[in-house]
Amino acid sequence: MRMASNALLTACLSLAITGCAQLSALQLAGSAVGMVLEATGITKKEGDPSKINRDMSVRIYAGEQLNLSATGKPLSLVAKLYVLRANEKFKAMTYPQMTSGEAEKEALGEELVSVREVVLLPGKSYDITLKVPGDATAIGIAGMFRAPYQGRWKLAFDNKLSFDNGITIGAHACAFNASKGTLVADISPESMRSLVGVQCNS
């Protein structure tokens, strides 16, 4: 009888150890998957898809004749990169609002996820990575040009359609143009891929 009890106890312990080993293996596998997700720019957070961040690649080429002064001298340019939940308020945002921090925040309201400023220098290129949450729908880019050409001081991109190839733009004397990324048509028509017709005012 005692021998049978010992055998039963040994069997139970063996099952418990096996179960723990299997659990540890599953935990290790889960950790490995998590590291792969982070390495590919996807941060896994349970329960709320809006908290899953992806990396958006943005490249900006600053032309040699960047943000020209009244005498034709190239100047630096402050570019602003916006991660947005929607684009309606960005569409309505005016140039004076964009250049004033408080007015800018008030104009964009709850649509604004984040904004980042980059100082561009003539003839330089910039590779920028934006963290974009799942509830964001657009990437906005605006430039504080000295004398902006009409609506060409800002661009808007559909972020979900732009992840694969990223966003590439050019910054010039008084305007932006876009070469990569899916533009939001009612803010940035396809004509914004070219500088044809752009005339800078002194």
Predicted regions and their residues:
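Bacterial N-terminal signal peptides that target proteins for export
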Residues: 1-9
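Bacterial Sec signal peptide processing site at the extreme N-terminus
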Residues: 14-40
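Solvent-exposed, flexible loop/coil segments flanking beta-strands in beta-rich domains
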Residues: 31-59, 194
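A short, structured loop/turn motif at beta-sheet edges
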Residues: 48-52, 131-136, 161-163
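Gly-Asp-aromatic-enriched flexible segments
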Residues: 57, 150-154, 158
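Short amphipathic, basic-aromatic surface patches that mediate peripheral association
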Residues: 58-70
